[in-house]
């Protein structure tokens, strides 16, 4: 029975365990109250999982610097790795400074459609950068372990209702407030929810293109549309049971197959 190690290489080495699954990503792998990794560990019959990254990590951060160095290190040191999981991109198109400053027009108050709320050439430009970051990560995996299966995922349709963590700014509602997106029907319906759905759908197309053009075996875990509105803990994260549902219904099958489990 293996354990989960979050950015703790010394503890991994002291344990004497080898790594079966390598994960790199954002809060969907690191969120303290539950995440995808914890229930995935159980669904895969408790392999050793090493997790790189942190809450708030962007795709364009994970593909360089110390995160990338650690990815290379783990792939080189542990030939037993049979699966790589990536969770990235959400922080590139959510949050103050990204959603409002890069994607949404400065004043959407008169908008009646999603397209009317976007800046020129966006969000295509943002997703082009996200796709490039994924391709960079996959190229690193391919250079060291071209045989390893890689799983990526497309999150789900979050609710822009302003719920966040204590001391953390809203990721969706506040940027939409800044851009004066109409509030009719919000937060569960209306233009604001349509923007979230459109961004997730465009992100899915981005990942689909990455999957279809990568020399590495990549599978898109389709989780968008799985969660009920009551299964969100806040604007970006499912409840503990919501994360478990996504693992059981979406992740478990392809991940077990990658590890040779029935």
Where are these regions (language model features)?
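Histidine-centered active-site loop/cap adjacent to the catalytic His
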Residues: 231-262
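Short N-terminal or domain-adjacent regulatory/targeting segments
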Residues: 1-19
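Short catalytic/ligand-binding loop motif for oxyanion handling, primarily in non-cytosolic enzymes
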Residues: 30-32, 92-96, 158-164, 228-231
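Substrate-gating cap/lid alpha-helix
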Residues: 161-219
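Conserved SGNH/GDSL esterase-like catalytic core that processes O-acyl groups on lipids
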Residues: 20-22, 28-125
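Hydrophobic, aromatic-enriched interface-forming segments
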Residues: 126-177
């Amino acid at each position: 029975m293996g354990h989960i190690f979050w950015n703790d290489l010394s503890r991994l080495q002291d344990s004497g365990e080898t790594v079966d699954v390598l994960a790199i990503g954002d809060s969907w792998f690191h969120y303290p109250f539950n995440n995808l990794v914890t229930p995935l560990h159980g669904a895969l019959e408790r392999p050793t999982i090493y997790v790189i990254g942190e809450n708030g990590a962007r795709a364009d951060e994970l593909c360089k610097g110390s995160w990338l160095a650690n990815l290379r290190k783990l792939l080189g040191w542990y030939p037993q790795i049979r699966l790589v999981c990536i969770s990235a991109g959400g922080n590139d198109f959510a949050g103050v400074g990204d959603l409002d400053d890069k994607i949404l027009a400065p004043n959407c108050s008169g908008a009646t459609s999603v397209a009317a709320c976007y800046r020129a050439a966006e969000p295509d430009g943002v997703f082009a950068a996200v796709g490039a970051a994924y391709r960079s990560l996959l190229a690193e995996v391919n250079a060291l372990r071209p045989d390893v299966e890689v799983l990526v995922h497309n999150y789900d349709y979050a609710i822009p209702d302003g719920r966040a963590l204590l001391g953390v700014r809203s990721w969706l509602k506040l940027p939409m407030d800044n851009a004066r997106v109409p509030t009719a029907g919000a937060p569960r319906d209306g233009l604001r929810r349509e923007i979230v759905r459109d961004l997730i759908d465009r992100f899915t197309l981005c990942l689909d293109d990455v999957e279809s053009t990568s020399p590495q075996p990549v599978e898109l875990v389709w989780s968008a549309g799985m969660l009920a509105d009551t299964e969100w803990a806040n604007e970006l994260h499912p409840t503990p049971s919501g994360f478990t549902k996504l693992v059981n219904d979406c992740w478990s099958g392809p991940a077990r197959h990658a590890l040779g489990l029935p």
